[in-house]
Design a protein with these regions (language model features):
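Alpha-helix N-cap and loop-to-helix initiation/capping positions
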Residues: 8, 12, 58-65
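A generic short-segment signal for beta-strand/edge and adjacent turn/coil regions
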Residues: 53-56, 122
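Glycoside hydrolase catalytic-domain groove-lining segments
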Residues: 1-54, 71-82
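Aromatic-rich peripheral "rim/lid" segments of glycoside hydrolase catalytic domains that contact
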Residues: 40-48, 60-68, 88-166
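Short, solvent-exposed loop/edge segments of extracellular or virion-exposed proteins
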Residues: 166-175
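Hydrophobic, well-ordered secondary-structure elements that form the walls
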Residues: 85
């Protein structure tokens, strides 16, 4: 796994991947990565990446920053001779609205990490943190299931794309 908001810079990821390759002779796959497209919470269950004080420098909580982050991770992985990158978890959207009591929906249909039944086999992790989706603001679909424009980044990585330069966000400056 490589989550830039938890695991450091792309350069750090490259160094780790190269070190694994050099020491073990094994190539690396990045089996999980993601980034938020919003700081909103879609189901009332706290998000793992809030999209506020925990953002990566140079990236906002926007659809464009989500796409740019994915592109930058893939480019850095390619430079480090990483075999590939999987996005986690692009379809993890809420099962009910933020304002609803989602507990019954989470138990019946599942959502997020686990249901309460997981306490039987994983009491210290999933058994404590079951319920809604902590990843809904990092999906590649909005809270109602419509695809985000950032989903196109995978097509652009394969086939290329050109676009006019545009400002995604302007960071606040304090003096």
């Amino acid at each position: 796994s490589y989550y830039p908001f938890w695991d450091g810079t792309n350069e750090n990821m490259q160094n780790v991947a190269r070190n694994i390759d050099e020491k073990s002779g094994k190539k690396v796959y990045i089996a999980e990565t993601s980034y938020c497209y919003t700081s909103e919470d879609g189901d009332g269950f706290d998000n793992s990446l809030k999209g506020t004080d925990d953002l990566v420098d140079g990236y906002a909580a926007t659809v464009q920053s989500q796409a740019t982050m994915i592109r930058d991770i893939c480019a850095a992985a390619n430079e480090a001779d990483v075999l590939g990158v999987f996005y986690w978890e692009g379809t993890w959207i809420p099962v009910g609205e933020k304002t609803a009591d989602n507990s019954a929906l989470w138990e019946k249909y599942g959502s997020g990490w686990a249901s309460s039944y997981s306490a039987d086999y994983d009491p210290d992790d999933a058994g404590l943190y079951y319920g809604g989706c902590s990843w809904d603001n990092q999906a590649m679909f909005d809270f109602t299931g419509h695809p985000l424009a950032s989903l196109n980044v995978f097509k652009y990585l394969k086939y290329g794309a050109t676009a006019p330069l545009a400002v995604d966000f302007i960071p606040e400056v304090s003096v």
